[in-house]
Amino acid sequence: MIRRGDVYLADLSPVQGSEQGGVRPVVIIQNDTGNKYSPTVIVAAITGRINKAKIPTHVEIEKKKYKLDKDSVILLEQIRTLDKKRLKEKLTYLSDDKMKEVDNALMISLGLNAVAH
């Protein structure tokens, strides 16, 4: 089953303009109820181009810890809804602490403020 925090290879083509494309890693950011019942999934693109400008919507992930080909950056300003058929292979999953970083960067990307419970 696809779960929030899983990292998959996905085919993001075709693209336009500055969108991330090709077959590349993505992290699942959709909630697990949606992951279970929906034919689509919400993801954030991951790039291995670590020299990209570090901005508050970027979260770094280490290749050794997450069994990736290279140190990478999750681009929370590059979120997309994909058909699950675009997901190819599960690579790894992110730790709870790393997902907290993802959540924070996602809130910044979407202009959301933290809500007190």
Curated annotation (Swiss-Prot):
Cross-referenced InterPro entries: PemK-like, Plasmid_toxin/cell-grow_inhib
EC annotation from Swiss-Prot or TrEMBL: 3.1.-.-
Gene3D superfamilies with a match to the protein in the record: 2.30.30.110
Keyword Transferase among UniProt keywords: no
Domain of life: Bacteria
Keywords, alphabetical: Endonuclease, Hydrolase, Nuclease, RNA-binding, Toxin-antitoxin system
UniProt keyword Nuclease, yes or no: yes
Signal peptide start-end: none
GO BP: mRNA catabolic process; rRNA catabolic process
Pfam families listed in its UniProt record: PemK_toxin (PF02452)
Family: Belongs to the PemK/MazF family.
Function per UniProt: Toxic component of a type II toxin-antitoxin (TA) system. Ribosome-independent, sequence-specific endoribonuclease that cleaves mRNA, thus inhibiting protein synthesis and inducing bacterial stasis. It cuts between the first and nucleotides of 5'-UACAU-3' in single-stranded RNA. Neutralized by coexpression with cognate antitoxin MazE.
Subunit structure: Forms a complex with MazE which is no longer active as an endoribonuclease.
Name of the featured protein: Endoribonuclease MazF
